């Protein structure tokens, strides 16, 4: 069993029910972000699933230099603070440099370390020092047991509020696969484990100037992951994925989320 972590009104880990971390890939604008957060809260309240709202203020690793990156840190954090204040739900976003850590910690309930940066010791340690909950995405290039070393870096700061997220493993060019063994392996480290169901179906750089995705497989991988007994599910969602400014091909349409959550909640209840 993993340790239980409290994030505002949300508890994850231990024998707690499945938690949803969800939101748009990137903050497109304030109105759309608030609209998405409100819709997610309504959906989650309807199926009794705890929610952490996710949105990035800067997508620093987009495929092309011309790709939309977001509003930037200052404006993005302001919008996320407004989500917290107006809806009372915890928020998570990702940082990309040491300089971003302190201002991000003033707003975010969970600071996320991107998969590509999970081995950057100075960055990981700096995030740990905030004593905020830290969500580390396992690099697409890493074995699940190697995440114990990443956890050790955070623990060295005295911070024990750690979440690990699986988001697929590189499989040749422009492709990812999900090894479900990684979920119980990482849970043995002792901290809550989340499955990123939408980035796991991403086709990195698969459209030349942007990444592709296979949204049709999100439900299948989600069901399989929840059946292993994970603590949370991570999904990027959008009201109209075809018009999303980032990661539309692998994002879940908000209209499709309630039915999927009901299935995942039922599976979670069986395995816990």
Swiss-Prot record:
GO molecular function: 3-deoxy-8-phosphooctulonate synthase activity
Known catalytic reactions: D-arabinose 5-phosphate + phosphoenolpyruvate + H2O = 3-deoxy-alpha-D-manno-2-octulosonate-8-phosphate + phosphate
Entry's Gene Ontology cellular component terms: cytosol
Any Pfam family matching the protein: DAHP_synth_1
BP GO terms, sorted: keto-3-deoxy-D-manno-octulosonic acid biosynthetic process
EC number: 2.5.1.55
Main location: cytoplasm
Domain of life according to the entry: Bacteria
Top-level EC class: transferase
UniProtKB keywords: Cytoplasm, Lipopolysaccharide biosynthesis, Transferase
Pathway(s) it belongs to: Carbohydrate biosynthesis; 3-deoxy-D-manno-octulosonate biosynthesis; 3-deoxy-D-manno-octulosonate from D-ribulose 5-phosphate: step 2/3; Bacterial outer membrane biogenesis; lipopolysaccharide biosynthesis
NCBIfam families in the record: KDO8P_synth, PRK05198.1
Family: Belongs to the KdsA family.
Alphabetized PANTHER family for the sequence: PHOSPHO-2-DEHYDRO-3-DEOXYHEPTONATE ALDOLASE
Name of the protein: 2-dehydro-3-deoxyphosphooctonate aldolase
Native organism: Geobacter sulfurreducens (strain ATCC 51573 / DSM 12127 / PCA)
């Amino acid at each position: 069993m993993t340790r239980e972590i409290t994030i505002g009104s949300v508890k994850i880990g231990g024998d707690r029910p499945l938690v949803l971390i969800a939101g748009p890939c990137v903050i497109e604008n304030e109105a759309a972000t608030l609209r998405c957060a409100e819709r997610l809260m309504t959906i989650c309240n309807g199926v009794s699933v705890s929610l952490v709202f996710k949105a990035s203020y800067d997508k620093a690793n987009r495929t092309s230099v011309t790709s939309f990156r977001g509003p930037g840190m200052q404006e993005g954090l302001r919008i996320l603070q407004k989500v917290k204040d107006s809806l009372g739900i915890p928020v998570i976003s990702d940082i990309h440099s040491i300089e971003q850590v302190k201002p991000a910690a003033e707003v975010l309930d969970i600071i996320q370390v991107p998969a590509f940066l999970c081995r950057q010791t100075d960055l990981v340690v700096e995030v740990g020092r905030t004593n905020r909950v830290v969500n580390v995405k396992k690099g697409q290039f890493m074995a699940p047991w190697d995440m114990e070393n990443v956890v050790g870096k955070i623990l060295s700061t005295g911070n024990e509020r750690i979440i690990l997220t699986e988001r697929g493993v590189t499989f040749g060019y422009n492709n990812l696969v999900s090894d479900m063994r990684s979920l119980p392996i990482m849970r043995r480290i002792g901290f809550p484990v989340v499955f990123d169901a939408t980035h796991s179906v991403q086709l990195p750089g698969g459209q030349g100037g942007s990444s592709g995705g296979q949204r049709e497989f999100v439900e299948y991988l989600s069901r399989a992951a929840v059946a292993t007994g994970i603590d949370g599910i991570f999904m990027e969602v959008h009201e109209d994925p075809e018009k999303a400014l980032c990661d539309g091909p692998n994002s879940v349409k908000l209209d499709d989320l309630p039915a999927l959550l009901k299935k995942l909640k039922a599976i979670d209840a069986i395995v816990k």
